[in-house]
Curated annotation (Swiss-Prot):
Role: Broad spectrum beta-lactamase which hydrolyzes penicillins, as well as cephalosporins except cephamycins. Also hydrolyzes aztreonam, but not imipenem. Confers highly resistance to ceftazidime, cefotaxime, aztreonam and piperacillin.
Signal peptide: 1-21
Protein name: Beta-lactamase SHV-13
Recorded name of the encoding gene: bla
Something else known: The class A beta-lactamase family has a specific amino-acid numbering system, sometimes called Ambler or ABL numbering and often misspelt as Amber. A multiple sequence alignment was used to derive a consensus sequence and then the consensus was numbered taking into account insertions and deletions. This allows use of identical numbers, e.g. for active site residues, despite differences in protein length. UniProt always uses natural numbering of residues, hence there appear to be differences in numbering between this entry and some papers.
UniProt-listed Enzyme Commission number(s): 3.5.2.6
Length: 286
């Protein structure tokens, strides 16, 4: 009898961790939704197994914004692997091909850019004209959506080009994904045989080299942690990030966070995403 009581006491002693530790990131997300007066979608997924660790509105649609550029470059790399494209191929373009926010491509009107350089510009600097030039090589928005269907993503869709795809109208399914679908697609691109090992390394390196994500999860990342990410921003308060991160400089988990329909400023949106990232990391370290 005494042995049974000791077993029960030991079991009860473990319950507070099981009950109180897990919801902590979700509590942060609920607070963020309240403070933003908007919606948050999030998923934390184990990279190796694909198991969902934390989720909130993970199956609701959110604007992709510039996070689609990771998938776009994944589609480009798939064409490279198939022998239909070369990262060294030079693409020339004109002034009329440039759209708003093209910090890299606008400097190369005279000499053009290679496909690889365009992917680097699209991911590391979120260059919109670079994205459009690449999008043309995969068949436009319809071609990228077809690629998504081919790799098993039946949810994510791209319907328009930069910069119209950032309209983010309430209830509009165009140019949207769900946190769960985006995480699963990113995992396929980086771990399955959809891309060669070389192309997987290249896609990941472009994300590691992201130069416009500083105020988000990177701002709360502990020393020695790995991060590779791509951010996005759009009208009507939309903001987002797709990221791989983990301790010991190793990618272990995928984190996708999307915001929409909030009147908050960009700085406030960045702060809330950083707060959610910090909560996930703190929970991870327990």
């Amino acid at each position: 009898m005494r042995y049974i009581r000791l077993c029960i006491i030991s079991l009860l002693a473990t319950l507070p961790l099981a009950v109180h530790a897990s919801p902590q990131p979700l509590e942060q997300i609920k607070q963020s939704e309240s403070q933003l007066s908007g919606r948050v979608g999030m998923i934390e997924m184990d990279l190796a197994s694909g198991r969902t660790l934390t989720a909130w509105r993970a199956d609701e649609r959110f604007p992709m914004m510039s996070t689609f550029k990771v998938v776009l470059c994944g589609a480009v790399l798939a064409r490279v692997d198939a022998g239909d494209e070369q990262l060294e191929r030079k693409i020339h373009y004109r002034q009329q091909d440039l759209v708003d926010y093209s910090p890299v491509s606008e400097k190369h009107l005279a000499d053009g850019m290679t496909v690889g350089e365009l992917c680097a510009a699209a991911i590391t600097m979120s260059d919109n004209s670079a994205a459009n030039l690449l999008l043309a090589t995969v068949g436009g928005p319809a071609g990228l959506t077809a690629f998504l269907r081919q790799i098993g993503d039946n949810v994510t869709r791209l319907d328009r080009w930069e910069t119209e795809l950032n309209e983010a109208l309430p209830g509009d399914a165009r140019d949207t994904t769900t946190p769960a679908s985006m995480a699963a697609t990113l995992r396929k691109l980086l771990t399955s045989q959809r891309l060669s090992a070389r192309s997987q390394r290249q896609l990941l390196q472009w994300m590691v080299d992201d130069r416009v994500a500083g105020p988000l999860i990177r701002s709360v990342l502990p020393a020695g942690w790995f991060i590779a990410d791509k951010t996005g921003a759009a009208e009507r308060g939309a903001r987002g990030i797709v990221a791989l991160l983990g301790p010991n400089n190793k990618a272990e988990r995928i984190v996708v966070i999307y915001l929409r329909d909030t009147p908050a400023s960009m700085a406030e949106r960045n702060q809330q995403i950083a707060g959610i990232g910090a909560a996930l990391i703190e929970h991870w370290q327990r």
